[in-house]
A protein has these predicted regions:
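A detector for small-residue-rich transmembrane helices and their helix-helix packing motifs
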Residues: 1-170
Length: 170
């Protein structure tokens, strides 16, 4: 549950504002491709998975807070989906791999900062999102159906509420 609740905690208004702005932007892009419900389910799920991997790889006392893992998961979802679905021209190397290069460039430009920046969380969020986005291409004929959008959106809300319910009862 901590991998999910950490996505909703922030160290201050500046931290929150940055995650809201970039989260809304990358979330909008993911929603345009996958539909809003499926996109937000994928963002929450791969963001939580990124937090889990970050925790497993880093020292045991590492603490990670903020939605930035999910923000970079959203960026990874878009890059992975566009790359795997071959939505870009496949004629030249630069076009085929443009989504990967573009995603990594945005990760490097926006995902690094001062000493308080959790670069591991950003990287694992992006990688988990990329994998999730690539996997979602296998279902692209169905994911835009209303029932999957409702299930995805409801599932995203249920994951967050469930994690907080467990946290408050612990």
């Amino acid at each position: 549950w901590r991998t999910v609740t950490a996505l909703t905690l922030h160290s201050g208004l500046g931290h929150l504002a940055g995650n809201v702005v970039f989260g809304a932007l990358f979330g909008l892009f993911a929603g345009r491709i996958l539909g809003s419900g499926v996109a937000w389910f994928a963002i929450i799920a791969t963001g939580a998975l990124g937090n889990l991997l970050n925790t497993l790889v880093l020292v045991p006392d590492h603490r990670s807070i903020g939605a930035s893992t999910a923000v970079f998961a959203a960026l990874g979802i878009v890059a992975g989906y566009v790359w795997r679905a071959k939505l870009m021209s496949q004629e030249r190397w630069v076009y085929r791999n443009g989504p990967i290069v573009g995603g990594l460039a945005l990760l490097m430009y926006t995902g690094t900062g001062d000493e308080n920046t959790d670069i591991g969380a950003h990287l694992f969020g992006f990688l988990c999102g990329f994998g999730g986005g690539a996997l979602l291409t296998l279902t692209r004929d169905r994911i835009l159906e209303d029932r999957w959008q409702w299930l995805g959106g409801g599932g995203a809300i249920a994951i967050i509420l469930g994690a907080w319910g467990i946290a408050l009862l612990s």
